[in-house]
UniProtKB/Swiss-Prot annotation:
Keywords: NAD, Oxidoreductase, Tricarboxylic acid cycle. Its EC number is 1.1.1.37. The active site is at H187 (proton acceptor). This is Malate dehydrogenase. It holds the Pfam family Ldh_1_C. It catalyses: (S)-malate + NAD(+) = oxaloacetate + NADH + H(+). Gene3D superfamilies: Lactate dehydrogenase/glycoside hydrolase, family 4, C-terminal (3.90.110.10), NAD(P)-binding Rossmann-like Domain (3.40.50.720). The keyword Plastid does not apply. Substrate binds at R92, R98, N131, R162. The keyword Transferase does not apply.
Amino acid sequence: MKQPVRVAVTGAAGNISYAMLFRIASGEMLGKDQPVILQLLEITPALDALKGVVMELEDCAFPLLAGVVQTDDATVAFKDADYALLVGARPRGPGMERKDLLEANAAIFSAQGKALNEVASRDVKVLVVGNPANTNALIAQRNAPDLDPRNFTAMTRLDHNRGMAQLAEETNSTVNDVKKMIIWGNHSSTQYPDLTECTVNGKPALEQVDRDWYENSYIPSVQKRGAAIIEARGASSAASAANAAIAHMRTWALGTDENDWVSMGVYSQGEYGIAKGLIYSFPCTCSNGDWKIVEGLDTSSDFSQEKMKATEQELSEERDAVEHLLP
């Protein structure tokens, strides 16, 4: 049996974590031969609820669960962490402007970035799930100057999966038949679900769907899927977000399938003309615990450029709104 790895999870008593922790403890994220120690962070008022979740984890008697830490102190939760899933974030309350939300979360993710910088493993893999995920990841990254910026990622795998599922439905195929889906940009309604490189059953996706459907139905539907779920369920997507977080980490740790890629919000070095330092979703391949942006794709069409720039613009504006709070 391998040595246990430490997996930190914030917002650990929340809905997304409740749909995620049991799957991590069962080996679904890092493999059936990898023991894990869960290091769970919550705000002080939620520690009792967290205790209940931990009791349930114990009652599952997972062979791979080598230990559980429960705390309201980030430096305890992130101590020697190999993986960190930052799920907890301030939700948008009634009458809150986006700017208020950005600032409230800036305080949370600054503190978490500092704690990661101080105590986490130097190779820690950080995934930000809590929204606004891309900018929260940027805030954490900027507060962790001793860690490689490449260690910080934001989740667009949920959008990626939504895009695959809706394309599979339209083409009467299964998600297994869909390859090379791309989500560019922000995990928000400005994201660009791009089918230019995508294939279904080995053939170009755009030859199998109507262009009008793609531009005017598919793209807005993927962009607004989160809102549609809130409308229908009366609560935001939790199980599907948990599933995407597990898939993002599993791919990062264990690698992408051959001849395919995934979408990840990662640190831009100027690829595809995107401003350096933004956390922007690109198509990525993973191997040996590292990610790499897929380069050399043709994004020169006016349609693609307009969409990629619009979501970049939103990310730049979000960064500018919190710049005064960043080191």
